[in-house]
Design a protein with these regions (language model features):
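Ca2+-coordinating acidic residues in Ca2+-binding motifs
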Residues: 37, 71, 171
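An intracellular "coupling" helix at the cytosolic face of ABC transporter transmembrane type-1 domains
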Residues: 1-19, 57, 61-64, 80-81, ...
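A hydrophobic transmembrane-helix motif
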Residues: 1-43, 99
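Juxtamembrane transmembrane-helix termini
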Residues: 23-33, 60-63, 77-80
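Cytosolic ends of transmembrane helices, especially the final helix of ABC transmembrane type-1 domains
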Residues: 20, 41-77
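ABC-type nucleotide-binding domain
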Residues: 77, 84-353
Length: 353
């Protein structure tokens, strides 16, 4: 192995170094070389050893860096498995029917069990649904299929009765805004953190214009990020995070508001929120969803949350268990059903009593 060879070479180098010392000392004792020559040679050996160690260190660093480069080139060589259909069509300019899952099953590559099994439901245009269930129920997997980060193992997903695999990928993802629970904290300016939610707007604006600034303002108001921006010394031009000089670190809740603004900036037909307010306090969460129901009027939305106070804003709630849909209906209907949803709701409610 690499460490074994490194040990052998180090031992040989040490033996050669001290072996040379023994030879010149013996030659000095026998009178073949003078004491001055001994001093000169010993100093030369020491300098030569330092030089050789430096060279070996450089080779070791080159070898280490080449491994990183190898990983980088391997990454560049990866070919996407989800590709456009040869006869792709654009996402509907305005959804009329919505999404439909038809007996969808899915398991991750190299996995033994299905993450989702036999799932059938609809998400109507303009409807807001909530996905509820315990960890591992398949909620996040479902929204990955909606965004076509994966294709179903079995079954089909339709958008306005068009197979989602026939829709242009760029067009599909432009019309879907997603905030995952592990959202990314970008060490950019506040403006860049928000506008990166819609790259087309950045590229089309050679300089800051009223239209772009207006969109930023609307997105920050929807997400309550306007309060965060107003508290920053340089406003939208403030660098966020501590990676760069003069950067300002935000709290978890403030970062989450910035991430929400990024999603609103896309102005998509479908907004997916995966635990979007997990870092917000109760008051901020209430304000966010109070605005959410008003501002998402006419647009579709999927909310994933373990907070039952949050999912009540949805038109319909889907309760998932072991990758299957076991209950479906409004909050009132599911409470009347007195099934798994009601059980978990009452369990959570008892914690506040």
């Amino acid at each position: 192995s690499k460490s074994t060879w490194a040990g052998i070479l180090s031992a040989l180098g040490t033996l050669a170094y001290y072996g040379a010392y023994v030879v010149i000392i013996l030659q000095t004792i026998s009178g073949l070389i003078s004491l001055g020559t001994l001093t000169f040679l010993s100093g030369s050996f020491k300098r030569m050893q330092s030089g050789l160690q430096g060279i070996m260190l450089r080779f070791s660093q080159i070898s280490s860096h080449s491994l990183y480069l190898s990983d980088l080139f391997d990454f560049f060589a990866i070919q996407p498995q989800i590709v456009d259909h040869p006869d792709k069509i654009p996402f509907p300019e305005k959804m009329q029917i919505g999404f439909r899952f038809e007996n969808v099953s899915f398991k991750y590559p190299d996995a033994d069990r299905y993450a989702i099994r036999g799932l059938s439901f609809t998400l109507a245009a303009g409807e807001k649904i909530a996905l509820v269930g315990e960890n591992g129920a398949g909620k996040t997997t479902l929204i990955k299929l909606l965004a076509r980060l994966y294709d179903p193992t079995e079954g089909n997903i339709y958008v306005d009765e068009i197979d989602i695999r026939s829709i242009d990928l760029a067009s599909l993802r432009k019309n879907i805004g997603i905030i995952f629970q592990d959202f990314i904290k970008l060490h950019f300016t506040a403006r860049e953190n928000i506008t990166i939610g819609n790259i087309d707007d950045i590229e089309s604006a050679n300089e800051l214009n009223g239209s772009l600034e207006s969109k930023i303002k609307i997105a920050t108001q929807k997400s309550l990020a306007d309060e965060v921006i107003s508290s920053l010394p340089q406003g939208l031009d403030q660098m966020l995070g501590r990676r760069f000089d003069n950067g300002v670190e935000l709290s978890g809740g403030q970062w989450q508001k910035i991430a929400l603004a990024r999603a609103y900036m896309r102005d998509a037909q479908l907004l997916i929120l995966d635990e979007p307010t997990s870092a917000l306090d109760a008051r901020a969460e209430h304000q966010v969803f109070e605005r959410f129901t008003q501002l998402m009027d006419g647009k579709s939305a999927v909310i994933i949350s373990h907070r039952f106070s949050t999912v009540r804003v949805a038109d319909r709630i889907l309760f998932l268990e072991n990758g299957q849909l076991v209950e479906e209906g409004s909050h009132e209907e599911l409470m009347e059903l007195d099934g798994r949803y009601a059980e978990l709701y009452n369990l959570q409610a008892r914690g506040y009593q």
